Curated annotation (Swiss-Prot):
Keywords (A to Z) from UniProt: ATP-binding, Cytoplasm, Kinase, Magnesium, Metal-binding, Nucleotide metabolism, Nucleotide-binding, Phosphoprotein, Transferase
Organism: Escherichia coli O6:H1 (strain CFT073 / ATCC 700928 / UPEC)
Record-linked Gene3D superfamilies: Nucleoside diphosphate kinase-like domain
Gene coding for it: ndk
Gene Ontology terms: biological process: CTP biosynthetic process; GTP biosynthetic process; UTP biosynthetic process
Locations listed in the record: Cytoplasm
Highest taxon, organism lineage: Bacteria
Gene Ontology molecular function: ATP binding; metal ion binding; nucleoside diphosphate kinase activity
Quaternary structure and partners: Homotetramer.
GO cellular component, one term: cytoplasm
Pfam assignment, any one: NDK
Protein name from the UniProt record: Nucleoside diphosphate kinase
Residues given in the record as ATP binding sites: 11, 59, 87, 93, 104, 114
């Protein structure tokens, strides 16, 4: 298996629940290395830019409003088959369909406020990482 990087967001509703540490512990227990992370409060412009592929869809404005409603934690995770394994750990986008023990089953409040985001492909991960992390902000872990 190839070592990949994927991008993760702990969304405002999960940050408000004080479960950042619990989510990080689950990332590490699943074998991911956290190679970059920071907390920030998105501006409307940042949220619209990040979710630009959804512009014009009925849920877009509500998504932007939610994602700017409080701080988020963005992270870069590294590991074998990281994109798919991270998505498996997150669970279904709609928490009503998320399997027990997944992050969305445990921390989501609704389809919009589903607690977490994860890249859906290696290409998306690279684009999303570059959106939030500059050169030198992601640190390879050699130990």
């Amino acid at each position: 298996m190839a070592i990949e990087r994927t991008f993760s967001i702990i969304k405002p509703n999960a940050v408000a629940k004080n479960v950042i540490g619990s989510i990080f512990a689950r990332f590490e227990a699943a074998g991911f290395k956290i190679v970059g992370t920071k907390m920030l409060h998105l501006t409307v412009e940042q949220a619209r830019g990040f979710y630009a592929e959804h512009d014009g869809k009925p849920f877009f404005d509500g998504l932007v409003e939610f994602m700017t409603s409080g701080p988020i934690v963005v992270s870069v995770l590294e590991g074998e088959n990281a994109v798919q394994r991270h998505r498996d750990l997150l669970g279904a986008t709609n928490p009503a369909n998320a399997l027990a023990g997944t992050l969305r089953a445990d921390y989501a409040d609704s389809l919009t406020e589903n607690g977490t985001h994860g890249s859906d492909s290696v290409e998306s991960a690279a684009r999303e990482i570059a959106y939030f992390f500059g050169e030198g902000e992601v640190c390879p872990r050699t130990r």
